């Protein structure tokens, strides 16, 4: 009995000793990096906070503490380096071998499988090469038609929710718009999310992204085996099956339509251009001389929908929120719409060419992405030792690239908390000092798609509405944003004490969101001020 009891009591000590000895080399190397002191077993997890917002604030606090440079931290026995140094960014993003994603992306595997976002090695290289033509200029023009159609429906929806000066959560509304756009462009089907919000498929998209975000910040729910015992697991399984069945059914129908068409002599390029979707491109593609399998089709379509939905919700949401707080910039954008489209042409859709000539709109979106990048962090995992800028980064380390921090670095951007779209005319940040869509061989393949959608939606909103803050008092009187991330700790604490309930509370997991929504008002425009 005593032997069993002693063994039971000694087990924790044995496990701690076992893990500590196994990490001696990695710890020794990483201790050369600045960072907070860690505890056995938990690392720095006890300092991180309990919510995505608290964790984000902790990261920025450490960033200030360690001179706005790289720092290391531990979550249990998982070693991490937060990368904010542009030299490190350049090495990592330019590397042809450092392309393995961090383990947080494993949370998407049950839904996305091993598509372009999560695959690595030869599969990633082959599929990247295969998918690149799907974002060719001509296909983007086709996608733009779909974006315009859904944006028109979105304007009608906004007229209803904004009626009578109503304060509403624009982030919530944008979620349904971008879901409609991505389903139309990815699979050539409309799920009418804006009108049918309670459908099982629409709700499933919302639920699964929330679950992934929740698991990312829960050590035990992050484990795929332990998550089976979580109270959320049964509902998650149901949600996952709903999405898998929906996507696979559409793929099967699309394959059948193509077979029927080809059997009677219809060529693939004779399908209506308007109906050509990302899925059609995949069905016409080959890898190693063969068509894609059903599983590969599922993985790439699901990945495209995931990456093209949540990120554009964030991009559109924060851009329109900034319109509400900065009326002077909104006026410049409205006048540009009049100049480009003509005083009598504001009611029609902007063409692909017109969108591309809206220079101030481009500057506005760049500045919005500097402050609120849709993807705040990118994770890479070192499968071998790397020497970066003279430092040895050991095998088994997660490199978290802090894209969000880059935008608030006053060494790169003067007066970073001031919203100044024209800064991108005056200041030319280095190629790895401003990377809202990543860079290098694993950059965002859908960057042009995302920017086109954001610009199309913002352009249409500006022409139809004057965007107002939730309350008049929330208009920025000096050009500064309400977000306090990146400020010196003392100034941040002082400013946070005066924050309004309608000021965004940022949270970051795989995409940037506002935990309390993006509340604003809209007033319909009647005429074009052609001055």
From Swiss-Prot:
It is an enzyme of class 1 (oxidoreductase). It is found in: Endoplasmic reticulum membrane; Microsome membrane. Its cofactor is heme. Its EC number is 1.14.-.-. It is a peripheral membrane protein. One of its GO terms (cellular component) is endoplasmic reticulum membrane. Heme binds at residues 307, 444. Keywords: Endoplasmic reticulum, Heme, Iron, Membrane, Metal-binding, Microsome, Monooxygenase, Oxidoreductase. GO terms for molecular function: heme binding; iron ion binding; monooxygenase activity; oxidoreductase activity, acting on paired donors, with incorporation or reduction of molecular oxygen. Its main location: endoplasmic reticulum. It holds the Pfam family p450. Belongs to the cytochrome P450 family. PANTHER family: CYTOCHROME P450 4D1-RELATED, CYTOCHROME P450 FAMILY 4. May be involved in the metabolism of insect hormones and in the breakdown of synthetic insecticides. This is Probable cytochrome P450 4e1. It comes from Drosophila melanogaster.
């Amino acid at each position: 009995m005593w032997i069993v009891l002693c063994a039971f009591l000694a087990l924790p000590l044995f496990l701690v000793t076992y893990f500590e000895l196994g990490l001696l080399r990695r710890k020794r190397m990483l201790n050369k990096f600045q960072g907070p002191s860690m505890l056995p077993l938990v690392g720095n997890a006890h300092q991180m906070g309990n919510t995505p917002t608290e964790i984000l604030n902790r990261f920025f606090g450490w960033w200030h503490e360690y001179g706005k440079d790289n720092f290391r931290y531990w979550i249990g026995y998982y070693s991490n380096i937060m990368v904010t140094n542009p030299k490190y960014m350049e090495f990592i993003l330019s590397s042809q071998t450092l392309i393995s994603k961090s383990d947080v992306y494993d949370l998407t595997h049950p839904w996305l499988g091993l598509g372009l976002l999560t695959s690595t090695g030869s599969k990633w290289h082959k599929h990247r090469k295969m998918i690149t033509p799907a974002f060719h200029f001509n296909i983007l023009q086709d996608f733009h038609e779909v974006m315009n159609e859904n944006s028109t429906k979105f304007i009608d929806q906004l007229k209803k929710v904004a009626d009578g000066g109503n304060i509403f959560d624009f982030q919530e509304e944008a979620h349904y718009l971008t879901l409609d756009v991505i389903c139309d462009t990815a699979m050539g089907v409309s799920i009418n999310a804006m009108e049918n919000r309670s459908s099982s498929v629409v709700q499933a998209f919302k639920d699964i992204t929330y679950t992934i975000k929740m698991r990312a910040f829960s050590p035990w729910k992050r484990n795929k085996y332990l998550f089976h015992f979580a109270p959320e697991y049964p509902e998650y399984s149901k949600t996952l099956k709903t999405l898998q069945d929906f996507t696979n059914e559409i793929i099967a129908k699309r394959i059948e339509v193509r077979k029927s068409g080809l059997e009677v002599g219809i060529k693939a390029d004779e399908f209506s251009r308007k109906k050509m979707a990302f899925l059609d491109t995949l069905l016409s593609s080959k890898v190693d001389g063969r068509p894609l399998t059903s599983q590969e089709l599922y993985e790439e379509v699901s990945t495209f929908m995931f990456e093209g939905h949540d990120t554009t919700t964030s991009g559109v949401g924060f851009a329109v929120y900034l319109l509400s707080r900065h009326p002077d910039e909104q006026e410049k954008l409205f006048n540009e719409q009049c100049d480009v489209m003509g005083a009598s042409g504001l009611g029609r859709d902007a063409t692909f060419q017109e969108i591309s000539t809206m220079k101030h709109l481009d500057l506005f979106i760049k500045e919005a992405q500097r402050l609120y990048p849709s993807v705040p962090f990118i994770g890479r995992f070192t499968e071998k030792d790397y020497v970066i800028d003279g430092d040895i980064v050991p095998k088994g380390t997660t490199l978290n690239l802090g894209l969000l921090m880059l935008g608030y670095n006053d060494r790169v951007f003067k007066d970073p908390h001031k919203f100044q779209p024209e800064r991108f005319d005056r200041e030319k940040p280095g190629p790895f000092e401003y990377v809202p869509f990543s860079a290098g061989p694993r950059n965002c393949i859908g960057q042009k798609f995302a920017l086109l959608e954001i610009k199309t939606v913002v352009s249409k909103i500006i022409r139809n509405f004057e965007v107002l803050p939730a309350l008049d008092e929330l208009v920025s009187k000096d050009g500064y944003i309400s977000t306090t991330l990146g400020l010196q700790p003392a100034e941040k604490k002082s400013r946070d004490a005066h924050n309004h309930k309608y000021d965004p509370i940022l949270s970051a997991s795989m995409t940037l969101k506002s935990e309390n929504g993006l509340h604003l008002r809209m007033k319909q425009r009647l005429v074009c001020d052609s001055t």
